[in-house]
Amino acid sequence: MTKLRKILIIILLAAPFLSVNAQKNAFGVPNLLKYDKQLLHFGFLVGYNQFDFLIKPQSDLSKYDSLMVINTTALSGFNLGIVTNLRMGKYFDLRFIPGLSFGDRIVNYTIQYDNGERLVNKKNIESVYMDLPLLVKFKSSRMHNVRAYVVAGAQYSLDLISAAKKKHAKTNEIVLKLYPNDFQAQVGVGFDFYCTYFKFSTELKMSFGLVNLLVKEENSFSESVTSLKSKLFQISFMFE
């Protein structure tokens, strides 16, 4: 995993330079003139993400052992994916980008004791998701070697390590358990840059969970939360 992270960091650091070079050539000699006429094309994706939660605590936290505040901390991760693009028309494409998302999230429980002392109990939630998004891409007219676009669609995600975490959890440790299946709505914007030999794209995308992931158990950490839905910000670099 460490070697993979190093490789991805190198790619992510190199991607902005590719974007700069692509922008320099945006109004030069047109590249890949027949590219957009292809019915089907493929590529790959590397990306940076921030996993987070849309959390809804119980309205009255005072009954949960002096629990005062519940909030979340977003942590950085990365994405890998395979791009499959189907041309639906001059301005529309259908995109299927199966991949893996690696990331962590933290749920913070702030507890105040009778003596006034405060303690923040952090529950770290690590996830590796297999993502299956289906997106519609609406493209602007091509301006020499660049075009803008927006995407929208839905994604099914399966947490591959959720079952393993439940199985290996210590008997005396209280952990937040999540259901492994998630469905999300997605929306994003991006730019396509037509390089000499391939198309390079940069994309910003948000994903919002549609289902409550929290497994209800008889402990204050679980009972004090009404709803826990996923939220994900992603910067993607695609080579097609």
Kindly give the residue locations of the regions a language model identified.
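Intrinsically disordered, glycine/charged-rich N-terminal periplasmic/extracytoplasmic linker segments
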Residues: I70-T72, F78, V83-M88
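Short glycine/proline- and aromatic-enriched beta-strand/turn motifs that initiate or cap beta-hairpins
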Residues: Q23-S76, E240
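Predominantly the C-terminal beta-signal and adjacent terminal strand-loop region
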Residues: P180-A185, G190-E240
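Gram-negative (and chloroplast) outer-membrane scaffold detector with strong preference
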Residues: N31, D36-L40, Y48-L54, V83-A163, ...
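Bacterial Sec-dependent N-terminal signal peptides
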Residues: M1-G28, F239-E240
